[in-house]
From Swiss-Prot:
Protein name: Tetraacyldisaccharide 4'-kinase
Keyword Transferase among record annotations: yes
Catalysed conversion reaction: a lipid A disaccharide + ATP = a lipid IVA + ADP + H(+)
Keywords for the protein's UniProt record, in alphabetical order: ATP-binding, Kinase, Lipid A biosynthesis, Lipid biosynthesis, Lipid metabolism, Nucleotide-binding, Transferase
Organism per entry: Tolumonas auensis (strain DSM 9187 / NBRC 110442 / TA 4)
Classification via Pfam families: LpxK
Annotated Gene Ontology cellular component terms: plasma membrane
Organism ancestry: Bacteria, Pseudomonadati, Pseudomonadota, Gammaproteobacteria, Aeromonadales
Pathways per UniProt: Glycolipid biosynthesis; lipid IV(A) biosynthesis; lipid IV(A) from (3R)-3-hydroxytetradecanoyl-[acyl-carrier-protein] and UDP-N-acetyl-alpha-D-glucosamine: step 6/6
């Protein structure tokens, strides 16, 4: 209910105004405390790139992180990714992912990134601990922090905000009146605002998600699926995924949305999706692989960004490393 209010303006929003004012005060004081040195923050010995957003809900950060890993690897860097590990409970922290790591341990997004890229990935509530582990044990020379824009305990060199190009900033108000974690003025302080879908504004970078052929959740083999299908998505904004399937021409019979990072029940999914082929997101697939049926598929997507933006980023990173004597 409240999320629907975030993308409209009505008198109901004002019921939350006192809480939004308190939220604004607390977030402002917290950020000032870090900037003034009242709260301690960690400076990594290698450049840190943060990918985040200022709104609640899915905006497409993970595809952006995957794009960065691929770009930096091709440029000769050894990137590592750190994350909070939402939805997972690791045996200890910091936790370095390995081939047998499950989403229940590290969270669905870190496992997706590790399986897709093969780069070092570490999770920890205190991201500085994850950074230290990657630098000391894996020899990474650049850190990508997934969803850490408001995690000011970790100092950063480059910040990117990923924005949903259709929903954008909703009604423009802070939580809980609206979807904003920080005020819109925060966008002026980042290196780039990346617009996922929709139409980027002149000062933004356009990003599009290119779908790849469906892959089987169990075997990872590609195939063409025709006829009626079901679809499920446990992501920040499921309608984006469902709409992408419809645009590709799939005859979607049933659309089922789950909460972001939700742990799935195998018996419930088997009962609900037993009649037709099921298409899910890659993020959901990492949680379903151990109990997937033969006709369950996932849709990989790849972020596409302008070449000029990639060149600009690599130049900025080279300058940072030169200035630090790396």
């Amino acid at each position: 209910m409240i999320e629907k209010l975030w993308y409209q303006r009505s008198w109901l929003n004002w019921l939350f105004a006192p809480f939004a004012a308190l939220f604004a005060l607390l977030t402002t004081m917290r950020r000032y405390a870090y900037r003034a040195g009242i709260f301690s923050s960690y400076r990594a010995p290698v450049p840190v790139i943060v990918v985040g957003n200022i709104t609640v809900g899915g905006n497409g950060k993970t595809p952006m992180v995957l794009w960065l890993v691929e770009l930096l690897t091709k440029a000769g860097y050894k990137p590592g990714v750190v994350s909070r590990g939402y939805g997972g409970k690791a045996p200890h922290y910091p936790y370095l992912l390995h081939p047998e790591t499950t989403a229940a341990e590290a969270g669905d997004e870190p496992v997706l990134i590790y399986q897709r890229c093969g780069c070092p990935v570490a999770v920890a509530p205190k991201r500085a601990k994850a950074v230290q582990l990657l630098v000391e044990q894996c020899g990474v020379d650049v850190i990508i922090c997934d969803d850490g824009l408001q995690h000011y305990a970790l100092q950063r060199d480059i910040e990117f905000v990923v924005m949903d190009g259709e929903r954008r900033l909703g009604n423009g108000w802070l939580m809980p009146m609206g979807p904003l974690r920080e005020t819109a003025s925060r966008l002026r302080q980042v290196m780039a605002v990346v617009c996922n879908g929709g139409q980027a504004r002149p000062d933004e970078i356009q990003m599009s998600l290119q779908p790849a052929p469906l892959r089987n959740v169990r075997t990872n083999h590609t195939a063409v699926v025709s006829g009626a299908v079901d679809a499920m998505a446990g992501i920040g904004y499921p309608p984006r995924f469902f709409n992408s399937l419809l645009k590709q021409g799939y005859a979607v019979n049933q659309q089922v949305a789950y909460a972001d990072h939700q742990a799935f029940n195998a018996a419930e999914l088997h009962q609900r999706f037993a009649q037709r082929p099921l298409i899910m997101t890659e993020k959901d697939a990492v949680k379903c692989r151990d109990f997937a049926l033969d006709n369950w598929w996932y849709l990989p997507v790849t972020a596409q960004l302008p070449e000029k933006f990639a060149t600009r980023l690599l130049a900025q990173l080279k300058e940072l490393r030169h200035g630090a004597g790396l």
